[in-house]
Amino acid sequence: MQNLFLSLLAAAVTVHAYGSGGSNWDQAYSRAKDALQKLSQTEKVGLVTGVKWMGGPCVGNTYKPESIDYPSLCLQDSPLGIRFANPVTAFPAGINAGATWDTQLLYARGAAMGAEAKGLGVHVQLGPVAGPLGKNPNGGRNWEGFSVDPYLSGVAMEKTIRGMQDSGVQACAKHWLGNEQEHYRDTISSNIGDRAAHELYVWPFMDAVKADVASVMCSYNKVNGTWACESDAINNKLMKEELGFPGYIMSDWNAQHSTVNSAVSGLDMTMPGSDFSNPPGSIFWGSNLEAAVADGSVPQSRLDDMVTRILAAWYLVGQDKGYPPVAFSSWNGGKANVDVTADHGTVARAVARDSIVLLKNDQRTLPLRKPKSLAIVGLDAIVNPAGPNACSDRGCNNGTLAMGWGSGTAEFPYLVGPLDAIQKRAAADGTKIVPSTTDDPTAGASAAAAAETAIVFINSDSGEGYITVEGNLGDRNNLDPWHNGNELVKAVAAASKNVIVVVHSVGPIILETILAQPSVKAIVWAGLPGQESGNALVDVIYGDTAPSGKLPYTIAKQAADYGASWINAETDDFTEGLYIDYRHFDAKGIAPRYEFGYGLSYTTFKYSGLWVNVYTSAGAANGKVVPGGPADLFEVVGQVSVFVRNNGRVAGAEVAQLYIGLPDSAPATPPKQLRGFQKMMLQPGQMGRATFELTRRDLSYWDVQQQKWVVPSGTFKVYVGSSSRDIREEGSFRVRRGW
């Protein structure tokens, strides 16, 4: 049996109360403790217990106490916009935000979502997502998160959370921990090794806690045999003690399984408070928790700690000062009495545009230069004829794909389809459009034969397991394009000498059949671009902006190359260990089709002048625990820089990427791991300098014996380049043992 945390055996119940650490939480805790003294026992229980499913205007609601000026909390999905409300902005999915590799856009997206949440009176927005991380390329909810790489995911978590909470809404980092597939998610045990847990799955949550995230959501699954929402190991010992998390842990909806065990194991809030349609007999807390405290099964100090954490988070983001009332109801169509969208469509378009990854561009097929005629082929080119919101929680694939399905969705205020946007540009250019807006290969070939260039739209969808779409129970059954996309492309390619393929997808698909067609000259990965889908695509394929997205995962030549997939069983032993995605491909010497971090531009970039300066010694991080972990773990201990020059004739943005290889003294470690990136916009001929700061954590591995982060001694390798495989500059530095 794998043991997740080797030093976590403890018989006594311990309350991991937050202690002063000089962070943003100190004043919030002081005020929360004052408010706690005014609450009755019943009011305390009401703050930690959801009212029930559909018991208030939001998907989650708490009881309002009378003794203090504190509301019924409104908790609402989703990670890409406000679910069950309108009008709101339907932003690009997390996976697209990650594909921008742009910290400013990540923050702007978070800030815009937070502003809309606050404007609607939402106190807690249920996002962003760090789990699933995406170890299984066909995992149903991978698209809600940012990347399969923990470093990129962690940076995205931090920037998004800061944006959301700066706007006044509490963010909720989810799903904690090991929620990597939809099949059996309510019963599966994710058995994760100690080191893999820390270096992969916990890593982005560390960044969330460091960013002062208000709340964390525990997941449906078990972790090493214990339900995540009643695991002392991951909630008390890891999240609250090791990571120093001052906020509160809430359950996913109906993920609680006990009264006492969940309380003493670190759960602070239960949602929705009852088992959906079966109240009140299914409630675990409420009066049952009050009785458990009365008979001593749950210490009074534990209940007080729950309440203090929840109140402190409310004070932390300033929700005690003129916060708007809830302006919608989730249960009557969500029509809000205010319009909170402002100019957020501009942000949505920028994220969608800058997340587009150009995978192939032979003979400079793109950008388009006022072609005489264009065939637009595929159902994915148009908005669902029944409307973009026709299917509940987007649980269908009947038009252009702009988000996956499930609770991680929002209502489209509008959806700009690719065909509509292209037609608008074509009219200005005098280009004739020949449409074939079905997935019928014969019709597609006929349209392609009548045009100078053909653009074929294909997609691949997934989502949450409570909805099955075309036989896919959340997780994808395979990595093929849906609706016989390969056959559609083959037919069009046989009829046209100049074919562009646009992919809207939740994750990687196998492209070998498409790449085997000689007339396929360009492939564009557009992901899940949200409401501005068509406009963002036109911005790129017509050259208004050079593509600058980079893959947030690896695209393989065949599905088996990933070495991981969702399993049809109730136990997942995470046998991949540290070796997922590019770490696996690198270690096994497998050539990907398109590697992690890959993405073409309309220009080229030259790297030069690598400079490395690292000033640290080997040893363990032993600093005082602050939000995120030991304080010295986040100390800057070195810099790496490189010059990047735009050698082309058009402006473009390049993402310079830093990878570090640990010395041989670090046991069984992937050859290289992402430890920095910087996106730079450069004019033709312009040179810029990318600078990466290295922290102790960036140079450390998790030592399972010491139960600490350790910087190993020896020679570290430095790789800087345009992707995980396109390395332009290499160097090294040596770290000696400390004295």
Curated annotation (Swiss-Prot):
<protein>
    <recommendedName>
        <fullName>Probable beta-glucosidase L</fullName>
        <ecNumber>3.2.1.21</ecNumber>
    </recommendedName>
</protein>
<keyword id="KW-0119">Carbohydrate metabolism</keyword>
<feature type="signal peptide">
    <location>
        <begin position="1"/>
        <end position="17"/>
    </location>
</feature>
<dbReference type="InterPro" id="IPR036962">
    <property type="entry name" value="Glyco_hydro_3_N_sf"/>
</dbReference>
<dbReference type="InterPro" id="IPR017853">
    <property type="entry name" value="Glycoside_hydrolase_SF"/>
</dbReference>
<dbReference type="Pfam" id="PF14310">
    <property type="entry name" value="Fn3-like"/>
</dbReference>
<dbReference type="InterPro" id="IPR002772">
    <property type="entry name" value="Glyco_hydro_3_C"/>
</dbReference>
<keyword id="KW-0964">Secreted</keyword>
<dbReference type="InterPro" id="IPR050288">
    <property type="entry name" value="Cellulose_deg_GH3"/>
</dbReference>
<dbReference type="InterPro" id="IPR001764">
    <property type="entry name" value="Glyco_hydro_3_N"/>
</dbReference>
<dbReference type="GO" id="GO:0005576">
    <property type="term" value="C:extracellular region"/>
</dbReference>
<dbReference type="Pfam" id="PF00933">
    <property type="entry name" value="Glyco_hydro_3"/>
</dbReference>
<dbReference type="InterPro" id="IPR026891">
    <property type="entry name" value="Fn3-like"/>
</dbReference>
<feature type="glycosylation site" description="N-linked (GlcNAc...) asparagine">
    <location>
        <position position="224"/>
    </location>
</feature>
<keyword id="KW-0732">Signal</keyword>
<feature type="active site">
    <location>
        <position position="252"/>
    </location>
</feature>
<comment type="similarity">
    <text>Belongs to the glycosyl hydrolase 3 family.</text>
</comment>
<keyword id="KW-0624">Polysaccharide degradation</keyword>
<keyword id="KW-0326">Glycosidase</keyword>
<dbReference type="InterPro" id="IPR013783">
    <property type="entry name" value="Ig-like_fold"/>
</dbReference>
<dbReference type="InterPro" id="IPR036881">
    <property type="entry name" value="Glyco_hydro_3_C_sf"/>
</dbReference>
<keyword id="KW-0378">Hydrolase</keyword>
<comment type="function">
    <text>Beta-glucosidases are one of a number of cellulolytic enzymes involved in the degradation of cellulosic biomass. Catalyzes the last step releasing glucose from the inhibitory cellobiose.</text>
</comment>
<keyword id="KW-0325">Glycoprotein</keyword>
<comment type="pathway">
    <text>Glycan metabolism; cellulose degradation.</text>
</comment>
<feature type="glycosylation site" description="N-linked (GlcNAc...) asparagine">
    <location>
        <position position="398"/>
    </location>
</feature>
<dbReference type="Pfam" id="PF01915">
    <property type="entry name" value="Glyco_hydro_3_C"/>
</dbReference>
<dbReference type="GO" id="GO:0030245">
    <property type="term" value="P:cellulose catabolic process"/>
</dbReference>
<dbReference type="GO" id="GO:0008422">
    <property type="term" value="F:beta-glucosidase activity"/>
</dbReference>
<keyword id="KW-0136">Cellulose degradation</keyword>
